[in-house]
From Swiss-Prot:
GO cellular component, one term: plasma membrane
Name under which the protein is recorded: Co-chaperone protein DjlA
Gene transcribed to yield this protein: djlA
Organism the protein comes from: Vibrio cholerae serotype O1 (strain ATCC 39315 / El Tor Inaba N16961)
Cytoplasmic topology ranges: 31-284
Region listing for Disordered, in residue ranges: 190-211
Length: 284
């Protein structure tokens, strides 16, 4: 199967960032699938493993992501109807075959078992990814965003996320930073900040101007800086994020032309958060 990457990317991309996240997730998944096809043809792509076991590694990543997601959802004792409905809706939207749906559902169900071997599964993920930081980080962020599927992270879910981060080689501080940034992004989306403006940007309308102190605080979290950060620190964080998300640079790395507008939306989100802070601090 050469579509596991797209399926996984679209599913968790939607959880992480709505339509933008789904499209970007599909793109990431496409890169995984492309590397898999090249390796099976006898080439050495150097991404997401290599050699004859490429297909097995791809499938391991897919199943592990769903099973760990099920484990996170079960951590608070009961998987909510909203979480189940969201998973079902996304599978329908992706037009999965019956076999593919069963594979994802079985993996999710396995993760809910009380004897689910989380540490062993995470070790297999590390092997499947070749220990590459970017792929392990992607896996962790999938779990963080899935924990926010029902709008909040339960303390028990947070504990499981810490186990996941530790098993993948991330520190508690690195996890907490991702949790704060994801929570801030979620609040922006719900409260009419940049996340909620994705639909507006498609219709050509202007960004809404959040006015509350809470939304300003979220803007700091989006940039990954504290409210006490100096102007220089804010600028440095902003430039770093813009460098990582600049549409032209993403295109140069293989982003399809059709996704240029999507990349622009992401950079606009970063710019919007920066503008709020710049005006507040009087940064020139």
């Amino acid at each position: 199967m050469h579509i596991f990457g797209k399926i996984l990317g679209a599913f968790f991309g939607f959880l992480f960032g709505g339509p933008f996240g789904a499209i970007f997730g599909i793109f990431l998944g496409h890169q995984f699938d492309k590397a898999r096809r090249l390796n099976q043809a006898g080439f050495q792509s150097g991404t997401f493993g290599a050699g004859p076991s490429q297909a097995e590694r791809q499938e391991e990543f897919f199943k592990s992501a769903f099973s760990v997601m099920g484990h996170v959802a079960k951590a608070k004792g009961q998987v909510t109807k909203e979480e189940i409905q969201l998973a079902t809706i996304m599978m329908d939207r992706m037009n999965l075959t019956l076999e593919q749906k069963r594979a994802a559902q079985d993996a999710f169900r396995d993760g809910k078992e009380s004897d689910f071997p989380l540490e062993q599964v995470l070790e297999r993920v590390k092997i499947a990814t070749g220990g590459r930081f970017d792929l392990l980080q992607f896996f962790l962020e999938l779990q963080v965003s899935s924990a926010f599927a029902d709008g909040d992270v339960h303390p028990s879910e947070r504990q499981v996320l810490h186990r996941i981060a530790r098993g993948l080689g991330f520190s508690s501080e690195q996890l907490e930073r991702r949790l704060r940034m994801q929570e801030a992004a979620f609040r922006f989306q719900q409260g009419g900040g940049f996340g909620g403006s994705q639909q507006q940007s498609h219709s050509g309308q202007q960004w809404q101007q959040p006015s509350s102190r809470h939304q300003l605080a979220d803007a700091y979290e989006v940039l990954g800086v504290s409210e006490s950060a100096s102007a220089q620190e804010v600028k440095r964080a902003y430039r770093k994020l813009m460098n990582e998300h600049h549409p032209d640079k993403l295109m140069a790395k293989g982003l399809p032309p059709e996704m240029m507008n999507v990349a622009k939306e992401k950079s606009q989100q970063i710019q919007h958060a920066y503008e709020l802070i710049r005006k507040e601090k009087g940064i020139k």
